Structures are given as C-alpha cells and as structure tokens.
Amino acid sequence: MPTQNFQSARKCRRVRHHISRRFNQRLICIAIATLGESASWAGGEQVLEKVEITGTATNLVGVADSANVGTVTKKQLEARTVYRPGELLESAPGLVVSQHSGEGKANQFYLRGFNLDHGTDLRTTVDGMLVNQRSHSHGQGWTDLNFLIPELATGLEYKKGPYYANEGDFASAGAVSIRYADRLDSGIANLGFGQNGFRRALIADSPKLGNGNLLYAVEAMHNDGPFVHGDDYRKSNGVLRYSEGDQANGFNVSAMGYTAKWNATDQIAKRAVDAGTLGRFDAIDPSDGGESHRYSLSGAWHRSTETSSTNVNAYVTDWKLRLFSNFTYFLDDPINGDQFHQPDDRTTTGVNASHTWQMQGLGLASENTVGAQFQNDNIFNGLYSTRDRQILSKTRSDHIAETGLGVYAENATRWLPWFRTVAGVRGDTYRFHVGSNLDANSGKVTQSIANPKLDLIFGPWAKTEFYLNAGGGFHSNDARGTTLTVDPKTGDPADKVPALVRSKGLEVGVRTSFVPGLQTSLSIYRLDFASELVFAGDAGTTEAGRPSRRTGFEFANYYKLSDWLTVDADLAFARARFRDNDPDGIGLRIPGSVEGVGSIALAVDNLGRWFGALQFRYFGPRPLIEDNSVRSASTATFNGRVGYKISPRTRVDLEGFNLTNRKASAIDYYYTSRLPGEPAAGVNDIHFHPIESRSFRVTLSTNF
C-alpha cells in the first residue's frame, strides 16, 4: 500500500472519534484509509474526498451507503428539548416518539408509515446492547429507554430500511444506535425543578484511574405529569464504566442499573370527555401503573491496524417488569373491571463480533466485513386478570428460552471514480422453546431466514451523490405464537404463526452539500411485509396480520446559517396499505399508520452568554380502522428552551413544553370499551391519551 494511504488510515481513526466505529465503518475506511483524499484517479488508484467533520454535523457525502443514514452529534442532541429520554430518537428525521400511559412504560414509536407499537421494526441499541425485547409480555420488540442518560450520549446514528447486513431483527423500518462516552471532558452536576412535580438531579465524572478512566453517573428523577391521578414516577439510575485506549484500540467494561415505579393514566374514552363526565387528564382505573428494573454488565474491545479493524462486545442484562393496564374498563368483567397484569422477568446475554479488512487489486479498492451476532433470552412472563393490582385469575404463564444467531458478510468496492457498490448477505437462525401452563401451547420451533442486500452509489458530482438500495429484512414474532394451538382465554383452537416474518425494501435517494452550510437528503422508498403477524400480549393470543406495503418519501435538511444559528427541517410522508385485495371487504388502510410528519428546529448559540432552541413537530392524522371512516386528528407542538451562561462552567436553562398549550392527543385508538352503565356489548369509540399541558422546567448545570 502506498505511503499516502497509510497516512490516510491514521486520519480514519481521527474521524472515528466523531463517527462511531460501528457506523458505516467500511466506507469511511475506503474513503479515507484506502483511497486517500481527492476525488480523482492517482497512481492507478481510486480515491475519495475526506469526511468533513464540524462541531455540529457530519457530512456523509462520499461516505454513506444511502440517503437515509445519518449521524446526530452530541452538540445537536444537547440542543434538543426533550420531555422524556426516548425523545432523543426524534432527532432522526421522520421518527415520532409518543406515550400512551405512565412515564415508566416503554414509549410508542412511529416511522415510515408504521405504528411501531413499543418498538417492533425499529432496532435500538445502546452501547451495542439490543434494547428491543423479544417475546415480551406486553408487546414484541418492547423498547424501554427510560434508563438512558442524555448527558452521557456522544451521538446518535440512524439507518432506515432493510439494506444493512449488520442490522438484523427489528430493523426493517429502521435502526438507531446510541453510544455512551468513555470519558467526559469535565464533571457534570445538574439540578432541575419544574411544574407537575418534576425534579431531577445528576452527577457524573470520569477521573483517571490507572491507565484509563473511571466514568460514573448517578441520576434521580420524579415526575407527576399533568394528570389528576399523578404518575408519581420515581426513577433511580446509575452507570459505572472503566475504559482504556482510544477509538482505534481499547476496551471498556460497564455496569448499569435502573429502577422505577409509577402510576399510569391509560388512554381514556373520548365519549366520556365529550359528555363532561371525565376530564382530559382523568383516569378511569387509577390503580394502573407498574414498576421496572434493568441491570446490565457489558464489555467492548476494539483493535485497528492500517488495513483492518476488529470489534467485539458482550453483555448480560437483567430486566424485570410489573405492568398493570385497563384499556376496556368493564367490558369483559362488569364487576371487577378489565385490569390485567403482565409480568416479565428475563435475563439476556449477547455477543457481537465483526472483522473488517481492506484489499486492493486490478486497480480496485475494496473492503470486506464479516460478523456474527448471538443473543439468548431466558424469559418468564404471563398474563393475569387483576383488580387494584391484585390477581384474580391466570390467563397464561410461560417460560421461554429464545436463541438467535445471525451471521453476515459484506463487500464494498469502488469500481469507477463515480461508482461504488456495497453488497451483503445475512443469515439468521432462531430457536424457540416454550413451556406454557397449558401443555397444548408448549413446544419447540426452529426457523432460519436469509436476506441479500445491495447498495449502488453514484458520484459524487458537485458534492452530490445518488443512491439505489434494495434488500430484505425480517422481524421475529413472539415465541408463544409459534407454539400456540389453544386460545388461553377461550379454549378455542388457535393457529400457529411463523417465527420470522420477511420484509423487502427498495429505495432511491440523493444527498448533497453543494450549498455551503446546507446538508440535504431526499429518499423515496417502498417496504413490503409478507404478513404483519403479531402476538397480542393483552389477550395472550396471536393476531394474523395481512400482507402490507408502505411507500413514501423523506426530506431532511441541516443548515448552518451562521456561527450562531442552525436549522433542522424535515418532512416525511407515507402511504400504508394492505395488499391482499381486501377479501373480507373491510378496507385496505392500516390502522394507526402515520401519514405525514414534519419538524423544524432552530438552535441559537454563541450570542454572548445566551443560547436557546425552538422545536416544532407536526404529527399528521391517521386512519384508526381499515375503511378509513374513523381518523385521528393531527398533533402539532412547540417546545423550546432559553439559557444563560452564568460563567464558563455554570449555566441555567429554562425549558418549555407544549408552549401553545394545545389540547391534542399523544396517541389515538378505535375499539370497543364499556363504562359503568353502558350496554353489555360495549361502545365503539376513539380512545386517546392527551399530550402534556404546557409546563416549564428550570435546570442549573455546572461543570467541574
């Protein structure tokens, strides 16, 4: 390899300080380490422009595989005003994070025409640990991000569509990765107070210890929300990490712990609010709520040479959830009510490993990656009928052992100065072992799936690239559905479902930084699912969904107008339909599928001691039933913050949420429920959870 490329390899490591080594590492190294820094032929070799890193954004022209991948920097995350930790994910264009219950419950997610429920089809990892929970008692892919400490995040990386060989289960709509810091620039101490019982304290630092750093963070928080029966959400959170080395060579070992308890105001019937018998923030069953904990031990090791890199991480997590909900009130049990309990106790172990090496020959530069991902879940969960959190009867209880192994290979090659490809293949095998309280619903199932991936990248010309992406993906179904033969509630025969459901995606896109200071990407996509089979945790049975298709576009812009003003503006639209010609005549719309999402965010800094931000988010109307005769309203909110730097190390922030105090819904459903005195068959109605009323929080922060 020429000396020039060895020097560029060192630059590659410096870039990785800003871009996670797990994100598009193959093309970063092709672009910088293997090919150099000019967009021309040199000595018979093809070379690319270097990756441009700024303090606020990463320019991925010449590096990214598609128009829908991106990196959100730490500075961008810090500028966001978030009501809850999970809302950090809204920095990915087109992604909406909501809540339909108490604060301790996993968020509701929307992306690319999907109502992702609590995380299905949006793969989320923190420090390489999969957050989505398989075969969860409440919902497949349950993604509880309440353990996240925003101040520790070094950045967020997102990808959309099933085009990436290193992304497996749950990644059909997209994948989000968050990485914690190994070392802080300085210690952090925050103290916050606000309306509705909000209180938060955080202290974190990373002093030197031996040859490395020992990072610690401790967080405590309380919040009631605007509800008549307050959430009384109490959270304790901690992180301890020892690390040595840098982004090129090093390791870390981490321990995390999170506990929480809360009350929940679940969605309420619109008819009761319209009649004046119930307020928007009232609860129908005030005993709803839950408690949860998450403990984890993890480690990561990485090593790089001039022409290769190896990454390994391993983790073990212990999750526990006690969740009490009541969505239909008195429909099934007019005496005791319909509250149900969904316990979930699990231990998850996982290992991820990948190796990348560069090659040159025949005037071509390429990079190869092979990897393996293993995860095992040992799960005890169930479904019980309750009243005031006291068990009345058992619907089902199960012990589940679920093991998944994925292997993948990928090649990235530049064929011409203006054309490169990324081709990959991924294979996954899952084994389910279900031991149910009903022997008829016990059993073992093994299923495998393979998916090809292909990216064609053209350019760059005038700092502009064009993309064509195609690939297959999948999500796993709840293990209990794969062995189900009897409805545990009624005793009727029930059909089993496939363990793995295939998806197919196709996308065209463009990315440009031609206008100085402006980064723009546009993508048009199609995503098909063979079936949206899901396990209905609220009923203990499977629901066989129909084949579906989603088409849409996403338009994302980041514009640094000056040293003191930046603008993020995103627009997304999706058309979601069942594609089975409607044999039952009920309609082709997919209930809950988001159609339009828009956002614009202004961030102001470097104005003396003042700084601030303003965010607008639009969440469009959605069909609530298949024939589109019942639809939700749209939701539009303004959040903002203004801050003052008391000294170089101390500042005060005032954050405001729902500044216009709109009375809108965080989520809407349409189904049958029964309030006291109503007909035994119940009433079909919209059920909604309101967005929080206008509120403010003040936080004093200091660095030490």
Residue ranges with predicted function:
Residues L130-K160, I178-R179, V497:
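Short acidic/polar hinge/loop motifs at secondary-structure boundaries
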Residues A300, S309-F327, G459-H475, V497-D563, ...:
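Membrane-embedded beta-barrel scaffold of Gram-negative outer-membrane proteins
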Residues S354-Q358, S521-F529, A544-E626, T699-N703:
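Gram-negative outer-membrane beta-barrel transporters
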Residues F193-H222, F227-T265, D288-S309, W415:
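Transmembrane beta-barrel wall of Gram-negative outer-membrane proteins
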Residues L77, V567, P621-R622, Y644-F704:
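C-terminal beta-signal and adjacent terminal beta-strands/loops
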Residues E157-A165, G174-P207, V218, N223-V228, ...:
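Short strand-turn segments of transmembrane beta-barrel domains in outer membranes
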Residues G86, E90-Q133:
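Extracytoplasmic beta-strand/coil segments of soluble accessory domains associated
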Residues G250-Y258, G290-N437, I457-W461, F514, ...:
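Face-selective signature of the C-terminal outer-membrane beta-barrel domain
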